[in-house]
Swiss-Prot record:
It is found in: Cell inner membrane. The keyword Cell cycle applies. PANTHER family: GLYCOSYLTRANSFERASE, UDP-N-ACETYLGLUCOSAMINE--N-ACETYLMURAMYL-(PENTAPEPTIDE) PYROPHOSPHORYL-UNDECAPRENOL N-ACETYLGLUCOSAMINE TRANSFERASE 1. Disulfide bonds: none annotated. Pathway: Cell wall biogenesis; peptidoglycan biosynthesis. The gene is murG. Its EC number is 2.4.1.227. Cell wall formation. Catalyzes the transfer of a GlcNAc subunit on undecaprenyl-pyrophosphoryl-MurNAc-pentapeptide (lipid intermediate I) to form undecaprenyl-pyrophosphoryl-MurNAc-(pentapeptide)GlcNAc (lipid intermediate II). This is UDP-N-acetylglucosamine--N-acetylmuramyl-(pentapeptide) pyrophosphoryl-undecaprenol N-acetylglucosamine transferase. UDP-N-acetyl-alpha-D-glucosamine binds at residues 17-19, 129, 167, 194, 250, 269-274, 295.
Length: 365
């Protein structure tokens, strides 16, 4: 650890979803190991309030909520609330005196980014999705550096493609993972997120029943909160309970990725980057209600590389999934090829790239 006079400080703004928080935590841990003091800016009602302290970082809260889709009165009041939240963020900056402020998405990023600009502190933005969110689109005009995970995210400003920071354990897994290209049972990991994906919960029991008539297939199905009993009962009704493991949550995604031959999942930015780093083929069903349909654009990063299949939710049914999984079960070499193509598009040093931009700006003063 450097002494107090030399210690660099960064204020990180990332919240609301794991897709914002976890990449930011990867950068925070890296910089902390380099002797930096890290502090967080977030909102008390969102997941960062719980996750960030669990990982050993202090967090300050400001009062801010999203404005998309709100009623007229809330929209009229929004400018006054934003001004208040900017003032709150400026107070945090004045007290903490960061050398750099980094925004990675979430409600606090907007006021925090404006406060950084008003305070004369370098502002780094990182956009995880292939289509930038509204806050990052606005802040990109005043940021010192704009970073993105995927090529072509920002079309009207200069942005550096650096990838999405992910946990170093997953990068290590990708380096040593050997895809199964023999005649073993096809191992299918189904991930629906914390609440589960209803489409997966509805069709996967029938998919397993259908594919198992001609190929050996086992499933590890993450069904989400309060869905365990219903989905498990459907697998049992179809006589497939011996070929499936059903869980509300999967705490150890490293173990799940290590086990799987192919993944059926949504296409959030972090998921896409993890699949690439680990080198896993996938069937991607973008969440149809994502803002600006950004999950479809995320998915195309892997689809265009030949590492994944894109299945828009309106066309997903038992037959579609059966066809794709049966094809992969009968052609393990293509499964291996898809995994290698996924690995080929991965940016494995994203954490260091983002951190190095912060370090460079701090050294410039």
């Amino acid at each position: 650890m450097t002494n107090q006079a030399e210690e660099k400080r960064i204020l990180i703004m990332a919240g609301g979803t794991g897709g914002h928080v976890f990449p930011a935590l990867a950068v925070a841990k890296y910089l902390s190991q380099q002797g930096w003091k890290v502090r967080w800016l977030g909102t008390a009602e969102r997941m960062e309030a719980r996750l960030v302290p669990q990982h050993g970082f202090d967090i300050d809260f400001i009062d801010i909520k999203g404005v998309r889709g709100n009623g007229l009165m809330r929209k009229l009041a929004a400018p006054f609330k934003i001004i208040r939240s900017v003032m709150q963020a400026r107070a945090v900056i004045k007290k903490f005196k960061p050398h750099v402020v980094m925004g990675m998405g979430g409600f606090a990023s907007g006021p925090g980014g404006v406060a950084a600009k008003l305070s004369g502190i370098p502002l780094v933005l990182h956009e995880q999705n292939a289509i930038p969110g509204m806050t990052n689109r606005l802040l990109s005009r005043i940021a010192s550096e704009v970073l993105c995970a995927f090529d072509g995210t920002f079309t009207d400003i200069k942005a550096e493609t650096v990838g999405n920071p992910i946990r170093k354990e997953l990068i290590a897994l990708g380096e040593k993972r050997k895809p199964v290209c023999d005649d073993d049972s096809l191992k299918v990991l189904v991930v629906g997120g914390s609440l589960g994906a209803k489409i997966f919960n509805d069709v996967m029991p029938s998919v397993l029943e259908g594919v198992s008539k001609t190929h050996s297939m086992t499933v590890w199905h993450q069904v989400g909160r309060d869905n365990l009993a219903t989905v498990k009962a459907e697998y049992q009704r179809l006589g497939q309970d011996g070929s499936v493991s059903v869980a509300e949550f999967i705490d150890d995604m490293e173990a799940a990725y290590r086990w799987a031959d192919v993944v059926v999942c949504r296409s959030g930015a972090l998921t896409v980057s993890e699949l690439a780093a680990v080198g896993l083929p996938s069937l991607l069903v973008p969440y149809p209600h994502a803002v600006d349909d950004h999950q479809t654009k995320n998915a195309k990063v892997l689809v265009n590389a030949g590492a994944a299949f894109l299945l828009p939710q309106p066309i997903v049914d038992t037959s579609k999934l059966m066809t794709k999984l049966s094809m992969l079960a009968s052609d393990k070499q293509e499964l291996c090829n898809m995994g290698q193509r996924a690995r080929d598009v991965a940016i494995l040093d994203a954490t260091q790239r983002v951190a190095n931009v912060c370090i460079r700006l701090a050294e410039k003063g």
